[in-house]
Amino acid sequence: MRKKTTRYSLKIFLSLTLFLAVVVVMAMVTVRTRARPQWQQKVDDWVLEEAGAADEVEFLVVLKDQADLGRISDRLSKAEKGAAVYNSLTDVALRSQASLIPDLKAAGADYRPFWISNMIWVRGDRTLVESLAGRPDVAHIAANPVVKLDLLPEQATAYSSAQDSAVEWNIALVQAPNVWAEGIDGSGVVIGGQDTGYDWQHPALMNQYRGWDGQSASHTYNWYDAIHEDNPNTPPGNPCGFDSPQPCDDQGHGTHTMGTMVGQDGAENQIGMAPGAQWIACRNMEQGWGTPATYAECYQWFVAPYPQDGDPFSDGDPTKAPHVINNSWSCPAGEGCVDPEVL
């Protein structure tokens, strides 16, 4: 009888201990949350740390008002759906950003508004971060770190090497030639790629570039450069420059990936999976360094391409959007790419 009582008492003791531990942890979390000012609860820790260590920091101001695209009918054509998405996203962003942008101008901050997600890229100090986070129309101040992707050097050079056979081994392995024999080679499809850029004059890519008609090139609506300024982490003097008016690759990886998609020059360089498709592109990295903002800007351009010097809110043309998009890169959690409000 004493053994049963002892066991029963032990169970009660362990249960009470576990209960008290949970209560203590919850109390600590509550105290910690209450200890942080309300505006800080909207701000990513990375932004607070960087803003405290530097005069200025890049961040993304995500607004509460976001477009509801679920109301757009699935029965619409691609062109109709593209127009509906573009109009809905731009309308919400223009309306809700109207009262915030004057404050950014008054603060002398650099900024770039987006509509793909209702947010604004901003470069400013901690005072501005606090001011923006305190606004009721702001949902979140997200991080925008500059991170170098692990792009293998051999990937950048393998594409330019001489090939021994007309059809590359990887293309043959998936039996793509058998599909081509059925008349399916990507014809009528436009592929969008975002990466380190693209060498549009490469012999295996030039004829598939939508901006090339065989005699002259038109890069408007077919190419966009989301790299607008030098990255402090890279050597000065980018070989492509910034806001490049034509496709350019400052690292080589992007050209390699496009070759895998559509590459063929009619001779030995039959290395693409869909050689009949056309391609358009956006540069989202400077020599392998990218940010959530540059990735989002390329996605925005793909939804409704616009000229390099155009206004994304009024000059976008959804009819020129690609049918599919290829991303041969990763965006880890440490780069701020786990936030569904941003990407």
Language-model regions, residue ranges each:
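Bacterial N-terminal signal peptides
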Residues: 15-25
